[in-house]
């Protein structure tokens, strides 16, 4: 573990990823409650999948559509799946393209800072823009490589940051 409180498992690196169909629940929430909201939405999505007898095709994720650390965040908790959706759990797509990736354990803020610095240091840029309400991302995800259904201790999760590049 580094002095920043983050345990780097792999990366940073660039990888080309294919488009991925998803199911997810999307909400606008305050930054200060985002992680509690993520946990609530994750529990809701897991319960929905169980009730509908759907086994995900891949890991769960948190997608940040819009980031405003002083205001509201547009977030989505989802999972890779091509199953039928409803009005609450909606279909979506993680776009294909070149992604900057970093796999880590423990704390997300230093991991995000590390990946963003690495992207800049490589002369790359994240596919985002100022929307007037915050920074809007083409795709910025935390992918939970550890299944939250089997490991409840979040500090033990291996998380992959995946930021779509321009």
Question: Where would I find each of the regions flagged by the language model?
Answer:
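A solvent-exposed interaction/effector surface
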Residues: 1-166
């Amino acid at each position: 573990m580094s002095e920043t409180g983050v345990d780097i498992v792999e990366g940073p690196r660039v990888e080309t990823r294919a488009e991925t169909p998803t199911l997810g629940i999307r909400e606008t929430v305050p930054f200060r409650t985002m992680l509690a909201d993520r946990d609530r939405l994750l529990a809701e999505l897991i319960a929905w999948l169980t009730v509908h007898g759907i086994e995900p095709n891949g890991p769960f994720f948190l997608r940040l559509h819009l980031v405003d650390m002083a205001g509201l965040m547009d977030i989505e908790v989802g999972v890779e799946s091509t199953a039928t959706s409803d009005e609450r759990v909606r279909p979506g797509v993680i776009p294909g393209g070149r992604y900057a990736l970093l796999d880590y354990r423990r704390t997300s803020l230093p991991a995000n800072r590390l990946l963003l610095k690495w992207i800049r240091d490589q002369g790359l840029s994240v596919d985002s823009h100022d929307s007037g309400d915050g920074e809007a991302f083409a795709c910025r995800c935390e992918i939970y490589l550890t299944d939250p259904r089997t490991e409840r201790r979040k500090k033990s999760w291996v998380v992959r940051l995946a930021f779509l590049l321009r």
